[in-house]
């Protein structure tokens, strides 16, 4: 094979001497070795490129609360399938989600308020969850709490959905000043767990704290349910990886309490 290779390139590649135990490259052989190493690298890169071409991309965006409390177990379930899919996850505001979908930077997205008004996009409910009242484990709130009995000075406000804010203004007034304003339930860990502290939280987020750090009650006059919407490009079918992800999401949501699924 070596002689055939030398005949093909038209020059000796090895120095041959009787009794020599080690092979020595000629000057042409040294150059050929360098070329061969480059060819090997190119071949490896070509194989890697072919592998990448076989992997699909699934690009998903969601608002902060959805990405923090709802989707992480679904991401885990989807990745455990070991599909030839690279998953891209983005946390975006509704307005940024709209632009990213229209520019084909996303396959689909989830928003938590129906504020998208564009004929090029389709918005449909994905699931619905009620708001529950969370308080310290040793609090004495009844199983059903009248909002009129709550002290807004003991509240941690974490929800900024327009419908929730209208409910809040109706019960506590537009000038109400809660104890703490935040965008995550984790901020509750900064507060001393005094008996009267409370927060209105979506059911799925509340479930992560039941028993461990909070007691859960219902409202006699609750805020409007929190609805998550699936946003896609109008008239464009979802890819097989996207459909499989939604299937995993549906399975996860059906196992949750207090959640109505529309997928």
Across the structure, where does each feature detected by a protein language model lie?
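Alpha-helical linker/hinge and terminal dimerization helices associated
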Residues: 8-9, 32-53
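A short LG(V/I)-centered, amphipathic sequence patch enriched
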Residues: 6-25
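Short, well-ordered beta-strand segments
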Residues: 57-61, 109, 156, 199, ...
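Short Pro/Gly-enriched coil loops immediately N-terminal to beta-strands
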Residues: 122-135, 148-152, 219-227
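Central regulatory/effector-binding core of bacterial HTH transcription factors
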Residues: 55-117
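Secondary-structure junction motif
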Residues: 141, 145-175, 238-246, 256
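Hydrophobic hinge/microswitch elements
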Residues: 93-97, 102-105, 112, 163-217
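C-terminal effector-binding regulatory domain of bacterial HTH transcription factors
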Residues: 166, 203-215, 221-263
């Amino acid at each position: 094979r070596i002689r055939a290779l030398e005949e093909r390139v038209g020059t000796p590649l090895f120095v041959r001497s009787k009794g020599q135990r080690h092979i020595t490259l000629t000057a042409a052989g040294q150059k050929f070795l360098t070329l061969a190493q480059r060819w090997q690298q190119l071949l490896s890169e070509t194989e890697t490129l072919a592998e990448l071409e076989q992997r699909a991309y699934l690009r998903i965006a969601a608002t902060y609360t959805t990405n923090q409390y709802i989707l992480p177990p679904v991401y885990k379930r989807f990745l455990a399938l070991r599909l030839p899919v690279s998953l891209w996850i983005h946390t975006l505001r509704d307005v940024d989600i709209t632009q990213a979908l229209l520019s084909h930077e996303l396959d689909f997205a989830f928003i938590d308020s129906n504020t998208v008004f564009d004929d090029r996009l389709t918005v449909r409910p994905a699931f619905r969850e009620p708001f529950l009242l969370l308080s310290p484990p040793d609090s004495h709130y009844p199983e059903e709490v009248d909002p009129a009995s709550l002290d807004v000075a003991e509240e941690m406000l974490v929800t900024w959905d327009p419908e929730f804010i209208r409910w809040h203004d109706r019960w506590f007034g537009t000038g109400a000043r809660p104890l703490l304003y935040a965008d995550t339930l984790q901020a509750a860990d900064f507060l001393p767990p005094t008996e009267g502290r409370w927060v209105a939280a979506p059911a799925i987020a509340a479930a992560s704290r039941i028993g461990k750090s909070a007691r859960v009650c219902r409202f006699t006059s609750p805020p409007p349910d929190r609805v998550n919407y699936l946003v896609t490009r109008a008239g464009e079918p979802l890819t097989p990886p996207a459909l499989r992800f939604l299937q995993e999401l549906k399975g996860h949501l059906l196992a949750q309490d207090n959640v109505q699924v529309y997928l």
